[in-house]
Amino acid sequence: MPRRTDLHHVLVIGSGPIVIGQACEFDYSGTQACRVLRAEGLQVSLVNSNPATIMTDPEFADHTYVEPITPAFVERVIAQQAERGNKIDALLATLGGQTALNTAVALYESGVLEKYGVELIGADFDAIQRGEDRQRFKDIVAKAGGESARSRVCFTMAEVRETVAELGLPVVVRPSFTMGGLGSGIAYSTDEVDRMAGAGLAASPSANVLIEESIYGWKEFELELMRDGHDNVVVVCSIENVDPMGVHTGDSVTVAPAMTLTDREYQRMRDLGIAILREVGVDTGGCNIQFAVNPRDGRLIVIEMNPRVSRSSALASKATGFPIAKIAAKLAIGYTLDEIVNDITGETPACFEPTLDYVVVKAPRFAFEKFPGADPTLTTTMKSVGEAMSLGRNFVEALGKVMRSLETTRAGFWTAPDPDGGIEEALTRLRTPAEGRLYDIELALRLGATVERVAEASGVDPWFIAQINELVNLRNELVAAPVLNAELLRRAKHSGLSDHQIASLRPELAGEAGVRSLRVRLGIHPVYKTVDTCAAEFEAQTPYHYSSYELDPAAETEVAPQTERPKVLILGSGPNRIGQGIEFDYSCVHAATTLSQAGFETVMVNCNPETVSTDYDTADRLYFEPLTFEDVLEVYHAEMESGSGGPGVAGVIVQLGGQTPLGLAHRLADAGVPIVGTPPEAIDLAEDRGAFGDLLSAAGLPAPKYGTATTFAQARRIAEEIGYPVLVRPSYVLGGRGMEIVYDEETLQGYITRATQLSPEHPVLVDRFLEDAVEIDVDALCDGAEVYIGGIMEHIEEAGIHSGDSACALPPVTLGRSDIEKVRKATEAIAHGIGVVGLLNVQYALKDDVLYVLEANPRASRTVPFVSKATAVPLAKACARIMLGATIAQLRAEGLLAVTGDGAHAARNAPIAVKEAVLPFHRFRRADGAAIDSLLGPEMKSTGEVMGIDRDFGSAFAKSQTAAYGSLPAQGTVFVSVANRDKRSLVFPVKRLADLGFRVLATEGTAEMLRRNGIPCDDVRKHFEPAQPGRPTMSAVDAIRAGEVNMVINTPYGNSGPRIDGYEIRSAAVAGNIPCITTVQGASAAVQGIEAGIRGDIGVRSLQELHRVIGGVER
């Protein structure tokens, strides 16, 4: 059946900002879909609020709307296209995660799709409802001959209590229509039931929750299926969770294909999955079904289904080489599976199910260290911020590779000291699921626990425990062997052990370098295998490789020779984490595509299954490998061999993937690997405070006073000389890890005690903290001679809030022409002083007309995608070309950069773009169930970002808030409680809110000051003050929890009562999903946003249209 001829214009909805539970896997799927639809001659409109995505680059759609993903904004897009005589025929919402699906459902139910004649494709409304609505899905499972957990959908707390009495405790609480398990959990007591179900009823857009029997401890499996309009169904992949039920699948280590299912169990699961898919009615696309198996009696139940492309779909795509999103998009426009050719083989159709001759392991990356006080227990609510994936010829090889891919402080077994305690302590820790469980499993086995005892304590299947036990046995052999011979070393490498791990067991080999030289001497190198979807039955056309150490010394590598073009290796950024996310992947993808077009063979090395960079057709070759020195060096050697007799490897790019590749630059250069762009010595110069300070002094550029300390006494002396407040931090960090603003000696002592353990080989830096300064961020290019300013951003929050968490505006809103010229001159001096070839990011603080240099990073920054979208200049592409020898003058002549001028001075008619950070506070709870503090500081906490772009600052800021957190209130009550130093600055914004008709609530001191300034307000007492006669009966926290407050303005100060009170206020706001503003500047911006919303003139415009207005570079 050829594609439908009645479809001409398709609207694709993306997934918005990166949040826990919904990450860049949807950029990967959306990018594939847009490419496919346009290749089929269809017109594509795209709505996505996330500027860091590849899919929002103007070349992927005809009309790219970087707008909030809400029903109201999407309706404006549909209406605008209809008004222009360019009617949208269909809406594809199955590739943008839960956000897109919920938006599509709302548009259908409100009649918008019917009004404009837009058809839902991929999955129709009924299929979405049947798959997502818990009760309807349960009925379908029964009809298909399957079984669900005993459960009931409840709409009120009374129904919840009645159901719990019937099922008995513990129970699982699950809201409908949410993603990443948000609001779900296992309740062991009636108090926990009340708390979770109450929160669940609030979290679910349909205001109902499912209460089900607990199947905690059962084995969990997933099937990834696809179905076409002719009822052909393929099972793309089976996935097994190593962690048992009770841990969200996104937080579990997972394996593909499933390892512990019998053939009979698998066939039963497969038959049931296909029957459910048909009953639900997903007739043109992909879906994911989760199952649980009772390990004691084999009882199989169906947990849930996602009638859309999901996180697991991205994993299954990368694991098998079967491009699920791409095929889903083709199925949605009418093709059948037998008509679609498998890209990887070039000859088999998509109705051939993938076959794997390797094992894939995915492991989650957490960030609990960023949220002090958060409960680290793993539950049914997802908490991981990223993931890594690896491929190997056996389970333990893939496991070893994925553990070192995570880049945590422990790079695999035996690379860090064991925790205190013996077997019993390890087994006790295993009973509560937490990050790093694999280490406790290995430790318990090594200390003598049996496989059965460890399986009983952890709930992990004995097969996986036995595999880790084999590693423990191998460790004993490695330690005991008199000499490490070729056979034993080869077995160790075949079992996934790194040189670093082997070196930790054999001290006489003098570290990792000693193991490497022994390996080289014995001729032990990895071979590179190919992901081909068919277990080598057909030849692969796409070079997608993974390494393996074969036991047979004669095993051959599958990397084909390529001698025509010079090669460039691009090192990706590894698993997403706070501080290093999709923004860096964006730059890597741009480098791959632009250098390929410029005549280079591009080679991508990365291990993140969610990203566009690890798509098999982004670079000319892909290596799915850990980003460690050992693994990258082996890839380099493989590429040198494959290019032997040709131009060879021109160099390795380390400055686009964030701190991970930068950290490898020196060791790679020392090993003879050519690094292109800014040399490693220059990177060091920018990181070394002494050398960088000298550079600034020579250029006459002021910087905040600072000192370097290795002891508390030194830090105290420096702080006294500089004057409090001071900013303290370890050196060499990304995302402000371990940074704090310290107001007194007592807090300083506490910090030094904690932070010096964080990076023992580097001292602590103590800087003067510039209060009330305006922070400025600059992205620039330098070719060694000329400097091109990409964009100058003004932060909305004051200096002291991490740049990744601060909202910022481009072009700057309050900076004058002379300020901008100061910034330009300083940036030029720094670029030349460091010796930058490529991108440079500099952060400044402007205070009392003095421009202070805070830091400079000679690499791609996380703002590069935002600046590129806002200015229409592809900075990452330009950077890649400059690193490989192009000049800025040459790129101007080619039209890649503006012919004259640069991004320092925006055109008069340029729109204002606002970037806002998206923070995951609502995902975390303290152990007692309380919310964690939403206070911002110098340590980065955001997981993603959105962009609002419009004619004026107020409208752009309002859009950014709507996209990140939901609309700012247009009326209602605002609660104000601020530190004394902020009271004067807040008079004007609060007065404006009162004039707009808002009721103002305030605590006693703030209320008194507001009334003195003619602002009517009502008093509430502070949370820690007791209720007394003559005082307000309601506290601020009571008012927020009672739903009487629509917005909170709360600025904190110090560590005493007000600080604690502030924590309670902000936590209550987070729990109630109420806008909570913690800075004066944020309050002023919010007022402008509210005014823009009340005026009602916030429209939508595509990037293509905006870029024409800017007069930007059209590509």
UniProtKB/Swiss-Prot annotation:
Boundaries of every ATP-grasp domain copy: 138-333, 693-884
Residues of the region (Allosteric domain) are 966-1115
Recorded metabolic or biological pathway in which this protein acts? Amino-acid biosynthesis; L-arginine biosynthesis; carbamoyl phosphate from bicarbonate: step 1/1; Pyrimidine metabolism; UMP biosynthesis via de novo pathway; (S)-dihydroorotate from bicarbonate: step 1/3
Q: Can you tell me which residues bind ATP 2?
A: 729, 768, 770, 775, 800-803, 843, 855
Q: What is its EC number?
A: 6.3.4.16, 6.3.5.5
Give the EC class as a word.
ligase
List of residues binding Mg(2+) 3: 843, 855
Instruction: Indicate which residues the UniProt annotation says bind Mg(2+) 2.
Output: 304, 306
List each coiled-coil range: none
| Required cofactor(s) | Mg(2+); Mn(2+)
Q: Which residues form the MGS-like domain?
A: 966-1113
* Record field: catalytic activity: hydrogencarbonate + L-glutamine + 2 ATP + H2O = carbamoyl phosphate + L-glutamate + 2 ADP + phosphate + 2 H(+)
Q: How is the cofactor bound?
A: Binds 4 Mg(2+) or Mn(2+) ions per subunit.
Matching entries from SUPFAM superfamilies are given as:
Carbamoyl phosphate synthetase, large subunit connection domain, Glutathione synthetase ATP-binding domain-like, Methylglyoxal synthase-like, PreATP-grasp domain
UniProt keyword list: Amino-acid biosynthesis, Arginine biosynthesis, ATP-binding, Ligase, Magnesium, Manganese, Metal-binding, Nucleotide-binding, Pyrimidine biosynthesis, Repeat
Entry-linked NCBIfam families: CPSaseII_lrg, PRK05294.1, PRK12815.1
Please describe the quaternary structure of this protein: Composed of two chains; the small (or glutamine) chain promotes the hydrolysis of glutamine to ammonia, which is used by the large (or ammonia) chain to synthesize carbamoyl phosphate. Tetramer of heterodimers (alpha,beta)4.
- Protein name from the UniProt record: Carbamoyl phosphate synthase large chain
